[in-house]
Amino acid sequence: MFKKAIKKALNFVRPLASGYLYYDHKLINSLSTTILLNEDGDLLTTKKVASLFAMQDELRDVFKPILTEIQNTSERKKTKILKKYGIENTTLITVLNILIDIAENPGKVKIISHKYLDLAIIQIENKENTFKSQMPKFYQSKEIGESVCIVGFAFPEYKAFKEQANYELIATNEIMNFPIFPISAMITRNIYDDQNHITMFEMSDGIELGMQGAPIVNTKGEIIGLVVGNKNIGPRKLSYGIDSKTIIEFLKENNIKYEEVKNEK
């Protein structure tokens, strides 16, 4: 049912690869999902995913001077400094985020967050070297009982990061294979947000870790929403997403280019 829709989604679904380095040198790979919106390289995802870039900057600003301070000290002084700042083996020291297949050199990023929904736009600094692709089309119509497909990235089985001296992470590009993971579901209910507006909807199946920010597409491959996360109702795991009507309003407010299918069905 969704074979053609998934092929379409391959044109605009992009992974965000993240490396998490802890004080005990444990390195964890993570994946998130974004949607390429236009030829400027603007991306749509959740606010939580976009916040990883702020986390990267904050950790660097906090720990770089501390690591420099303990670099050439005795073990006794090092222990005192670590205790002073509350640093343990499980303390997260460094995060490195890499946008995949967006531009030759994306540069710095700017984040535009929705006022209260888990929705954000990522804008790259260098827009002239973006990789060209077929852009998505948003469709505002949806129905309870409609079959949909969530097309994102999960199960981060890759090796993209390497630790250098003093807890620096670099991208190795050693293994950069990011297969998509589609999940089919059915729209079950509309959801009111905290402002008492219907901006979201519920789906009959849950998503896997890493799929937050993935597009929810209909059988034609048109985006009818963006998946935000899961919720548990008894023993059952359901997912929910923000609808295209709300997304389009957000894009218009911020003068972001996008394509839309008019409701002619």
Predicted regions mapped to residue ranges:
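Beta-rich catalytic cores
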Residues: S30-L31, D118, Q212
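Catalytic nucleophile loop of clan PA
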Residues: I35-L36, G206-V227
